[in-house]
């Protein structure tokens, strides 16, 4: 275990179609096109784009039309592409003859690896590990992806069970001059499909016999850009998830078919204008590690609608039976995901101001996203807390406690406390100390000691660096993301040896 040389590497400053047999896949679709790209509302044209070559694709997944200009398709349905501009393609179904728009990442050419349920073309090594380590994937679950380091080559990633717990092992798939493939030179295959078929019958030197392709949950439905302010009757509140400083949070449904989280304003704690300001900040910040904002109801009681995260907040999850059994590498990877989201906030010249485990949400696949931007603000250089504003003392940097001045460096301090929450499986920071005692102790240079469950390298090289007294001496989130992602790779080989 240890750190790579990330400190030196990262700045502190931060065609024609013919009938074929289609094998459709069961894995979940990739994310739908972003909110900012919703130009597919232009009326469908009855004629094909003159510059568009005649092209036929197959639907990789079901797509339910959201608007009357969309084309509803079923997995395996063949389509003719009429226009392929941007993230939305105009297509005609060869089954129904209807025309409309479909997300471009929901279709693929009829003769392509994309129709194989085990093929994840552009997924990174790190995300491949995260997906394979999800609870629904068992030992032997696998995927094939394009190599990040060798363009045109492929890698096989397999979930394994060792004495250290669940791990993912990676194998290089090498190409032959005649177009074949191999992992071990003693046996070659004409296609990737043949390679998968062989290692699915027997492991033949791999860590596990290949069992099932890596699975994902169904994707979230598209949310159209023009559905920002929505009618209250389009929402159904089903189950109360909790309450906070600004209101309650419910699990519910939009238009009876899309599961969402709905945050309601608690009257008297925040003006409608401030609540809508929170929503507008969230709307401008879009990243895969940030909980996504979908819409708002602007008439009181005001609602804010976001994506639903099935496992709830990280603080509560760490205290469950499943959470308490998470290995240290999984905990550090969760920390890296939070740092990735905060690095985006840092690049966007914004701050969070309430970063703690209670405001990190966990998905069904145990991916973490940053939530609750009620206190985040777009800033020039710093945001001064308004008189009377509340903030959690045990997570707050000294300069913010004493002077009410918040910068991204105050978020870095909070991140150090968040790391302590994670490695102690949700223990309250500064156990046994009151808020005034914490303030006095920090003034005299006190810092929480290294827990027994925390590696010294993590505590000395990362956590305590976040707690530097001078804000400018604290690391950037870019740096923190880098060292946390690399924490366990310094002593690991990038690939398994040839079987």
Curated annotation (Swiss-Prot):
Main location: membrane
Keyword field contains Zinc: no
Bilayer topology: Lipid-anchor
List of catalytic residues: 354 (proton acceptor)
Cited InterPro entries: Blk_SH2, Kinase-like_dom_sf, Non-receptor_tyrosine_kinases, Prot_kinase_dom, Protein_kinase_ATP_BS, Ser-Thr/Tyr_kinase_cat_dom, SH2, SH2_dom_sf
Keywords (A to Z) from UniProt: ATP-binding, Cell membrane, Kinase, Lipoprotein, Membrane, Myristate, Nucleotide-binding, Phosphoprotein, SH2 domain, SH3 domain, Transferase, Tyrosine-protein kinase, Ubl conjugation
GO molecular function: ATP binding; non-membrane spanning protein tyrosine kinase activity; protein tyrosine kinase activity
Keyword field contains Signal: no
Domain SH2: 118-214
Entry's Gene Ontology BP terms: B cell receptor signaling pathway; peptidyl-tyrosine phosphorylation; positive regulation of insulin secretion
Residue numbers carrying Phosphotyrosine: 383
Matching SUPFAM superfamilies: Protein kinase-like (PK-like) (SSF56112), SH2 domain (SSF55550), SH3-domain (SSF50044)
Post-translational modification: Phosphorylated on tyrosine residues after antibody-mediated surface engagement of the B-cell antigen receptor (BCR). Ubiquitination of activated BLK by the UBE3A ubiquitin protein ligase leads to its degradation by the ubiquitin-proteasome pathway.
Disordered: annotated span: 1-34
EC number: 2.7.10.2
Catalytic activity, as annotated: L-tyrosyl-[protein] + ATP = O-phospho-L-tyrosyl-[protein] + ADP + H(+)
UniProt xrefs under Gene3D superfamilies: Phosphorylase Kinase, domain 1, SH2 domain, SH3 Domains, Transferase(Phosphotransferase) domain 1
Any one of the GO CC terms: plasma membrane
Residues linked to a lipid group, N-myristoyl glycine type: 2
Tissue: Expressed in immature Vgamma2 gamma-delta T-cells (at protein level). Expressed in the B-cell lineage.
Effect of residue 495 to F: Leads to constitutive activation of BLK
Binding site for ATP: 241-249, 263
Record PANTHER family: TYROSINE-PROTEIN KINASE (PTHR24418)
Protein role: Non-receptor tyrosine kinase involved in B-lymphocyte development, differentiation and signaling. B-cell receptor (BCR) signaling requires a tight regulation of several protein tyrosine kinases and phosphatases, and associated coreceptors. Binding of antigen to the B-cell antigen receptor (BCR) triggers signaling that ultimately leads to B-cell activation. Signaling through BLK plays an important role in transmitting signals through surface immunoglobulins and supports the pro-B to pre-B transition, as well as the signaling for growth arrest and apoptosis downstream of B-cell receptor.
Name of protein: Tyrosine-protein kinase Blk
Organism, scientific name: Mus musculus (Mouse)
């Amino acid at each position: 275990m240890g750190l790579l040389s990330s400190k030196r590497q990262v700045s502190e400053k931060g065609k024609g179609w013919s009938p074929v047999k289609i094998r459709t896949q069961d894995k979940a679709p990739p994310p739908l096109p972003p909110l900012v790209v919703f130009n597919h509302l232009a009326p469908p044209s009855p004629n094909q784009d003159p510059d568009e070559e005649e092209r036929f694709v197959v639907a990789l997944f079901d797509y339910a039309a959201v608007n009357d200009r969309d084309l509803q398709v079923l997995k395996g349905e063949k389509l003719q592409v009429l226009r392929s501009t941007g993230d939305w393609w105009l297509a005609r179904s060869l089954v129904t003859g209807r025309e409309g728009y479909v997300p471009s990442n929901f279709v693929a050419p009829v003769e392509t690896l994309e129709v194989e349920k085990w093929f994840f073309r552009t997924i990174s090594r790190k995300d491949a590990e995260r997906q394979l380590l999800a609870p629904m994937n068992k030992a032997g679950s696998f995927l094939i992806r394009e190599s990040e380091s060798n363009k045109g080559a492929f890698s096989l990633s397999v979930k394994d069970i060792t004495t250290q717990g669940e791990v993912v092992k990676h194998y290089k798939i090498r190409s032959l001059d005649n177009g074949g493939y191999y992992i071990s030179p003693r046996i070659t295959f004409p296609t990737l499909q043949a390679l998968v078929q062989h290692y699915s019958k027997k492991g033949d030197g791999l860590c596990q016999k290949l069992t099932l392709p890596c699975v994902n949950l169904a994707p979230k439905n598209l949310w159209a850009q023009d559905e920002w302010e929505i009618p209250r009757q389009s929402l159904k509140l089903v189950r109360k998830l909790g309450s906070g400083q600004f209101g309650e949070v419910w699990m519910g449904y939009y238009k009876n078919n899309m599961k969402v989280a709905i945050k309601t304003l608690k009257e008297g704690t925040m003006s409608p204008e401030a609540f809508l300001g929170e929503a507008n900040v969230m709307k401008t910040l879009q990243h895969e590690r940030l909980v996504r904002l979908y819409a708002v109801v602007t008439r009181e009681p005001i609602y804010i609608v976001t994506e639903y995260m099935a496992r709830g907040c990280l603080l509560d999850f760490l205290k469950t039976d499943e959470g308490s059994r998470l290995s240290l590498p999984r905990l550090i990877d969760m920390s890296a995901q939070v740092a990735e989201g905060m690095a985006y906030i840092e690049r966007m010249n914004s701050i969070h101001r309430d970063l703690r485990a209670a405001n990190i949400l966990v998905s069904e696949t145990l991916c973490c996203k940053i939530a609750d931007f009620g206190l985040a603000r777009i800033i020039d250089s710093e945001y001064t807390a308004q008189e009377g504003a509340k903030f959690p003392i045990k997570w707050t940097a000294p300069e913010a406690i004493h002077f009410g001045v918040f910068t991204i460096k105050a978020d870095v301090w909070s991140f150090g406390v968040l790391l302590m929450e994670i490695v102690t499986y949700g223990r309250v920071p500064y156990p046994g100390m009151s808020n005034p005692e914490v303030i006095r102790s920090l003034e005299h240079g006190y810092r929480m000691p290294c827990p027994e469950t925390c590696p010294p390298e993590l505590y000395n090289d990362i956590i305590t660096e976040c707690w530097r007294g001078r804000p400018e001496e604290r690391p950037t989130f870019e740096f923190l993301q880098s060292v946390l992602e690399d924490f366990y790779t310094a002593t690991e080989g990038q690939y398994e040896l040839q079987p």
